């Protein structure tokens, strides 16, 4: 089997050296070239035809976003962004994902060499995932038209969504058409701390419903979406007749915190047939067992189809476990969620 060919673009010679060490330490990949800026990278891409590009967000001569935008228009390829953990860095990274980057890794703020080498396995996994990603499915998407929701039967209805690689754009596409009369939406997207708040704020500006980073103990309200904070698990809980959010530091599940399985299992327990579950693009199997639990509890469950996924991992696993009611294209997910929950069809007979 041929190795994954990687090209790294970073203005820091140290970062280029570290990325080369990391990539070449894995037997299934190799660093074919490195570039100090996008202009040099342009020529190296033509020369080496890499499978995956790692790209620093902030560089001289041409910044990473400008280069990414041109690259995705002229020569689409899998890109993993390398970002700082600053507030500005998180906003720029989210814009990069919108432009078509597959995923991102964050630079440690102190001890770059030790920090990056500690991330070695995670970086390699993101490169592997990017190499398998469906680039055609990751073209920037126009804002969908607002849908109309039928009358909610009760405030007990809610929607739970889980996603990973490619999920930030998929979630935007699902939330943007939702009207103010939508039921509550609770979302777990695999994302490190420092990024989920920026992600929620970005969505809040784009959506009619209110979108925020979830807080422990807050009441779950219709017309609102709640994003699990990075490096924290989020669960649905009950407080009398109301739903409540529970945030905690439990151990990683399926190597993830937040974990989609943790969210879905809690929704199965506390909402059951009053819920609709949605599993979107992502690598691995997180959420598959939780979706099966939701299905067995009477929830209607939706998986994104392979053609519209960046990575058809999590949806495939959920389908294979037998916990999916229907498989639909990303463009139809919002409509199906509202149709099932508004008509009371979250209850399966």
UniProtKB/Swiss-Prot annotation:
Keywords, ordered alphabetically: Chemotaxis, Cytoplasm, Hydrolase, Phosphoprotein
Domain CheB-type methylesterase: start-end pairs: 152-344
PTM annotation: Phosphorylated by CheA. Phosphorylation of the N-terminal regulatory domain activates the methylesterase activity.
Broad EC category: hydrolase
Gene3D superfamilies recorded: 3.40.50.2300, Methylesterase CheB, C-terminal domain (3.40.50.180)
Sequence ranges assigned to domain Response regulatory in this UniProt record: 5-122
Gene: cheB
Domain commentary: Contains a C-terminal catalytic domain, and an N-terminal region which modulates catalytic activity.
Active site, UniProt feature: 164, 190, 286
GO CC, alphabetical: cytoplasm
Protein location: Cytoplasm
Family to which this protein belongs: Belongs to the CheB family.
Known function: Involved in chemotaxis. Part of a chemotaxis signal transduction system that modulates chemotaxis in response to various stimuli. Catalyzes the demethylation of specific methylglutamate residues introduced into the chemoreceptors (methyl-accepting chemotaxis proteins or MCP) by CheR. Also mediates the irreversible deamidation of specific glutamine residues to glutamic acid.
Keyword Zinc part of the UniProt annotation: no
Protein name, as recorded: Protein-glutamate methylesterase/protein-glutamine glutaminase
GO MF entry, a single one: phosphorelay response regulator activity
UniProt EC number: 3.1.1.61, 3.5.1.44
GO biological process: chemotaxis
InterPro entries reported for this sequence: CheB-like, CheB_C, CheY-like_superfamily, Sig_transdc_resp-reg_Me-estase, Sig_transdc_resp-reg_receiver
Reactions performed catalytically: [protein]-L-glutamate 5-O-methyl ester + H2O = L-glutamyl-[protein] + methanol + H(+); L-glutaminyl-[protein] + H2O = L-glutamyl-[protein] + NH4(+)
Modified sites of kind 4-aspartylphosphate: 56
């Amino acid at each position: 089997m041929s190795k994954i060919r990687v090209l790294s673009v970073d203005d820091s010679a140290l970062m280029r050296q570290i990325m080369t060490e990391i990539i070449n330490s894995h037997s299934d990949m190799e660093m074919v070239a490195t570039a100090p800026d996008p202009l040099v990278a342009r020529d190296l891409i033509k020369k080496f035809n890499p499978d995956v590009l790692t790209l620093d967000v902030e560089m001289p001569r041409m910044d990473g976003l400008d280069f990414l935008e041109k690259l995705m228009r002229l020569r689409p390829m899998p890109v993993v962004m390398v970002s700082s953990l600053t507030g500005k860095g998180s906003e720029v990274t989210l814009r990069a994902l919108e432009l078509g980057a597959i995923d991102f890794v964050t630079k440690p703020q102190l001890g770059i060499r030790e920090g990056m080498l500690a991330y070695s396995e995670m970086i390699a996994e993101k490169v592997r995932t990017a190499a398998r990603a469906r680039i055609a499915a990751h073209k920037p998407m126009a804002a969908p038209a607002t849908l109309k929701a039928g009358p909610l039967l009760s405030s007990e209805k809610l929607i739970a969504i889980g996603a990973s690689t490619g999920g930030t754009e998929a979630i935007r596409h699902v939330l943007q058409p939702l009207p103010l009369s939508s039921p509550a939406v609770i979302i777990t997207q695999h994302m490190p701390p420092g990024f989920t708040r920026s992600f929620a704020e970005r969505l809040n500006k784009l959506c009619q419903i209110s979108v925020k980073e979830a807080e422990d103990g807050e009441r779950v309200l219709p017309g609102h979406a709640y994003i699990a904070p990075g490096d924290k698990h989020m669960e649905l809980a009950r407080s009398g007749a109301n739903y409540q959010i529970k945030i905690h530091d439990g151990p990683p599940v399926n190597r993830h915190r937040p974990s989609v399985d943790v969210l879905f299992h809690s929704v199965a327990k506390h909402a059951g047939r009053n819920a609709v579950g949605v599993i979107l693009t992502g690598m691995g199997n997180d959420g598959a067992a939780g979706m099966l639990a939701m299905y067995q509890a009477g929830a209607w469950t939706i998986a994104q189809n392979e053609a519209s996924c960046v990575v058809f991992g999590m949806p495939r696993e959920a389908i294979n476990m037998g916990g999916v009611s229907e498989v639909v294209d990303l463009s139809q997910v919002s409509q199906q969620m509202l149709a099932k929950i508004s008509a009371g069809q979250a209850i399966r007979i």
